[in-house]
């Protein structure tokens, strides 16, 4: 079968024929036909050779790329319940170490040993291939009503997790407004990629005032999505920023993009660091640290998601499709065939929000 493979940590990507579906299913396994994969910055980081933590499975030279996925059940083992042939599914990405208490409790996104594997990223083949076998416990069933946007579920699950973490830690004090809503709270989201736009949707629907920040004017599709979600796009090179910020979310990974905004943070506010990149150096002085301390400002990083976050993401996709018709579909800016993937993985097309590989 056809697959898109890399040889991390080396640079490069190619489409090749592989033959790794050559055994019978165990009782709790499922055979899945891949329908679509999303392409994200992590995939491009692996292809470029910049993500040095990426590695193939033990005993293999190549890694099948791809962690954003949508598939359809083709066959299943006799002990698989709740899934039937023809059902649409999304596989979760991270698989636990099997040792620490978090992994044993289904929260591999908080693995304490670091011995986890991640499909298409480190130690486990991913989903950019025609078929794959997975344990049923790692699959999330997708309602037919959202199949057209379900390839967005994996990135959304990360947003769902970060939002739930924020609401948990902000219970340290009264954070809602006098009327019990959040309409007095300003959220500044640095970056207007798919994750930034999903954060915008998440906080807008919860009643926050969401601002999407970039150092340029929005592309037409970005402007449309932000406007329809009742958020506001800000070009930080020319537009006025909100006077105060109650939540700062960085999806860019560039310190120079978000650290200068910290001085605008309100008392008792929070910072979520989501984006990752390498190389840039940016000075943080003692005055800024003092400001964070004296104003009870909380900072935390967030990565990956649990199966429950995926399941909650299904609910959000269902609600958003009804609340914001066409917005989520517009995030998928290009659909390509597997043979076209290497070119797009090397170079991000201008105006891209989400490029999707179609296997059907």
Curated annotation (Swiss-Prot):
Pfam families found in the cross-reference section: ADH_N, Glu_dehyd_C
Catalytic activity: D-glucose + NAD(+) = D-glucono-1,5-lactone + NADH + H(+); D-glucose + NADP(+) = D-glucono-1,5-lactone + NADPH + H(+)
CDD domains referenced in this protein's UniProt entry, alphabetically: glucose_DH (cd08230)
UniProt-annotated binding residues for Zn(2+) 2: 97, 100, 103, 111
Listed EC numbers: 1.1.1.47
GO biological process entries: non-phosphorylated glucose catabolic process; protein tetramerization
Record-listed NADP(+) binding positions: 192-195, 214-216, 274-276, 302-304, 348
Binding site for substrate: 42, 118, 154, 158, 304
Cofactor (UniProt): Zn(2+)
DNA repair among keywords: no
Name of the protein: Glucose 1-dehydrogenase 3
Organism: Saccharolobus solfataricus (strain ATCC 35092 / DSM 1617 / JCM 11322 / P2)
Gene (UniProt): gdh3
